[in-house]
Design a protein with these regions (language model features):
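Intrinsically disordered, low-complexity serine/threonine-rich segments
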Residues: 11-12, 26, 117, 426
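General helical structural elements
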Residues: 7, 14-16, 106
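Alpha/beta-hydrolase-fold enzymes
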Residues: 301-425
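Bacterial signal peptide processing site
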Residues: 30-33
C-alpha cells in the first residue's frame, strides 16, 4: 500500500488497453444457474462447462523478477484463461478473460484440491502468487516439521494465482485523464488551503476519468468473488480453499458470505475489518504507522544509541518533527511500514535525514551537487561501517529532494501516451473502483477534510492523506454485501501481526469478534504485513495442520515474532 495513497497496493504488472473488452462483448452467454440458493437466477452453463487450456506460461506476463521461479518448477507450472461474465446480473452483455497460473500438486494421486491466492490491493495482480508460494512450499527445508508440512502442501494441493478482473493483460481497467493533475505536495507536511484544494480537485479528476470507462462499473469484490466460484466449478472442486492477504481477506469474506457451503479451508492473513465499509477503514493506517514509529522504530534507535548517536526515543522524535517539510516528506513518504525486516534501514534513513539537515543548515547556499560532495566528508554515525551505510541513504534523500515529485502523479500507476495524454493504470484504477463500488464511503469532501485534520494532529509524521478521497466523487450505487451471520460458524483461520501497519490488529480483532467460528494466530512484536509462510514452526505448523488435516488452533493463540533486527548497521 503506497504511502501517499493510503490503502493503495503497488502491483508491478500492467497490461495494454485496446479492443479486448469490445471484442469480449460480442460473445453471448447461455446455460443454467450454478447455485439457486446463493446466486441470482441467470444462465451460467457456458461458463461452468468450459475447459481450461493449460499452456506454458509466457515469461513476460510473470515479470522478469519471477522468471527464475518459473524455471524452477517448469513441469508443474501452467497458465490458462478463464472466461467469466462481464456482468453477473446480465451475463449476455459480454465476457471477460481472467488469467490463471497453476502450480500443480506434485502428487496428483493424493490431491486434496486447489488453494486459490489473492495477494491484496485491491489492484494487485495475483498471477505470480501461485509461483512464489509454490516455490516456497516445494523447496521448504525437510529438516524441520514446518518445512516438511509445507512440502506436503505442495505435493497435495494445486496452487493457483489469478489476475482479478481489471488487472492483467486481457481486460485492464485503464482510465484516460482529461488534462493534467495539479501540482500537489505531501498532505502530511503541507496543510495549506491551496494544497488541500489541489488534492481534492485531483481526486475528483481521478474519479471522473474512471467513471468515463464503462468497465469500472463491473470492477468490485462481489464480481471477483463470483469469478472465484466459477474457477472452483471449472476445476471440479466441491469447495474453495483460499489464502487471502490484506484486501484478500475482504475478498475471502465476501466469497464466504455469498457461498458459505462452498468454503473449504480459508486463511485470512493480515485482516481488514469486515464489519465496516471498505473505503472508510483505511484511515486506521495512519494510527498504525505512527504506532510503529513510536513503539518500535524510535525505541530501536535508542537501544542502538552507541552506534547511531541519535539520543533517546523522545529526543529523536522531536528532532524528526523539527526537520524542514521537504526533508520530512522525502523521509516519511518512502518509509516502509509493512516489512519489519527493513527496520534497520528505516532507522538509518532517520540518521541520514538529520545529518543532511545539519549540512543544509551549515551550507544554506549549497545546491544538490555540493550537498553530495559534502556527504562524503560528513560524520553521520560514530561507527565507520554504520557511517558508510547512512551516507549512502543521505545521497538517496538528496536525489528525492531533487525530484520534487508531484504527489498526484506516481510513475508506477500512471503513464503518458504518445500524444502526451495521461492514463491511470490498474494498480490505481482497480483499487479506486473496488473501494468506491463495494460499499461506498462516508460523508463528503468536507467530512474527510475534517478527518484529515484530526489525523495530522494525532499522527504528525504520517497522517492526513484522507483529504484526498476519490470515492466522494463516485456517484455509483454500492453493492449489497450479504450479512455476516451466514458465515458466523465457519471454521476460518486468521493470521495477524501485532503491529501491522497496513491492516491494524484492531481490524483483525473486530473481524474475529464477528466470526464466532473463526480462530486467530497473533504474531507478537512484529509489523510484517502478510505473514504465511512465516518461517517459524509455531506459525507455519499450525497453518499447515489446518490445510492438511483441518485442525484448528484455539480461538486466540499467539506466536513469538522473529527478531526485529540485530545490531544497527550490521
Amino acid at each position: 500500500m503506497a504511502r501517499n495513497l493510503p490503502g493503495f497496493s503497488r502491483a508491478r504488472w500492467a497490461g495494454l488497453a485496446g479492443g479486448a473488452l469490445v471484442c469480449g462483448m460480442l460473445v453471448a452467454c447461455g446455460g443454467t444457474e450454478v447455485d439457486a440458493q446463493h446466486s441470482p437466477p441467470y444462465p451460467l452453463a457456458e461458463f461452468t462447462q468450459q475447459t481450461l487450456d493449460w499452456q506454458a506460461c509466457a515469461p513476460e506476463r510473470i515479470g522478469q523478477d519471477q522468471e527464475a521461479l518459473l524455471a524452477a518448477l517448469p513441469d508443474r507450472t501452467r497458465c490458462a484463461l478463464l472466461r467469466v461474465p462481464l456482468d453477473y446480473d446480465h451475463p449476455a452483455e459480454g465476457v471477460l478473460q481472467i488469467e490463471l497460473l497453476r502450480v500443480a500438486a506434485a502428487q496428483p494421486q493424493s490431491r486434496l484440491g486447489a488453494i486459490v491466492f489473492n495477494p491484496g490491493g485491491p489492484g494487485e495482480d495475483g498471477l505470480a502468487s501461485a509461483l512464489v508460494h509454490g516455490m516456497q512450499w516445494a523447496l521448504a527445508s525437510p529438516e524441520d516439521v514446518s518445512g516438511t508440512q509445507l512440502r506436503e502442501m505442495s505435493q497435495r494441493f494445486d496452487v493457483i494465482g489469478f489476475s482479478p478482473r481489471g488487472t492483467g493483460a486481457n481486460h485492464p481497467l485503464i482510465c484516460d485523464v482529461p488534462g493534467t493533475f495539479e501540482d500537489q505536495d505531501s498532505l502530511t507536511f503541507d496543510r495549506s488551503a491551496e494544497n488541500l484544494q489541489r488534492a481534492q480537485r485531483n481526486a475528483q479528476r481521478m474519479a471522473r476519468a474512471c467513471l468515463d470507462n464503462p468497465l469500472s462499473a463491473h470492477i468490485h469484490t462481489e464480481a471477483t468473488a463470483r469469478d472465484m466460484d466459477l474457477l472452483r466449478a471449472v476445476l471440479g472442486d466441491a469447495q474453495l480453499n483460499y489464502i487471502g492477504y490484506s484486501y484478500g481477506t475482504w475478498l475471502g469474506s465476501w466469497y464466504a458470505r455469498l457461498f458459505p457451503q462452498r468454503v473449504g479451508r480459508m486463511l485470512l492473513d493480515s485482516s481488514l475489518d469486515v464489519t465496516q465499509r471498505l473505503d472508510d477503514q483505511f484511515m486506521l493506517q495512519d494510527m498504525a504507522n505512527q504506532r510503529i514509529l513510536d513503539e518500535i522504530m524510535l525505541p530501536f534507535a535508542e537501544r542502538h544509541r552507541d552506534t547511531l548517536a541519535l539520543g533517546s526515543a523522545s529526543e529523536l522524535r522531536a528532532a524528526l518533527l523539527a526537520l524542514p517539510s521537504s526533508l520530512k516528506e522525502a523521509l516519511f513518504d518512502d518509509m516502509d511500514f509493512m516489512d519489519s525486516s527493513l527496520l534497520e534501514r528505516a532507522v538509518l534513513r532517520m540518521s541520514a535525514a538529520l545529518g543532511l539537515d545539519a549540512l543544509m543548515r551549515s551550507h544554506p547556499d549549497a545546491d544538490n551537487d555540493a550537498l553530495l560532495a559534502l556527504v562524503d566528508s560528513h560524520l553521520f554515525a560514530p561507527v565507520p561501517r554504520v557511517n558508510v551505510a547512512v551516507a549512502r541513504l543521505a545521497r538517496e534523500l538528496i536525489e528525492a529532494l531533487a525530484g520534487d515529485e508531484n504527489q498526484a502523479v506516481k510513475a508506477d500507476w500512471i503513464e503518458t501516451d504518445a500524444q502526451g495524454a495521461l492514463r491511470l493504470l490498474p494498480e490505481f484504477t482497480v483499487n479506486m473502483a473496488v473501494r468506491c463500488n463495494d460499499t461506498g464511503t462516508a460523508g463528503d469532501a468536507a467530512y474527510w477534510l475534517g478527518v484529515s485534520n484530526d489525523q495530522v494532529a494525532r499522527y504528525p509524521m504520517v497522517g492526513g492523506d484522507t483529504a484526498s478521497k476519490p470515492c466522494v466523487y463516485w456517484p455509483v450505487s454500492s453493492r449489497t454485501i450479504p450479512p455476516l451471520s451466514t458465515i458466523a460458524g465457519l471454521p476460518i483461520l486468521m493470521l495477524q501481526s501485532r503491529y501491522d501497519g497496513a491492516t491494524p490488529v484492531e481490524s483483525a480483532q473486530a473481524t474475529l469478534a464477528a466470526l464466532p467460528g473463526a480462530r486467530m494466530i497473533l504474531v507478537e512484536n512484529e509489523y510484517q504485513h502478510g505473514l504465511f509462510p512465516y518461517g517459524t514452526e509455531c506459525v507455519d505448523t499450525q497453518v499447515a495442520n489446518y490445510f492438511l488435516q483441518g485442525t484448528l488452533p484455539p480461538r486466540n493463540s499467539s506466536c513469538a515474532g522473529k527478531a526485529l533486527a540485530g545490531k544497527a548497521g550490521a
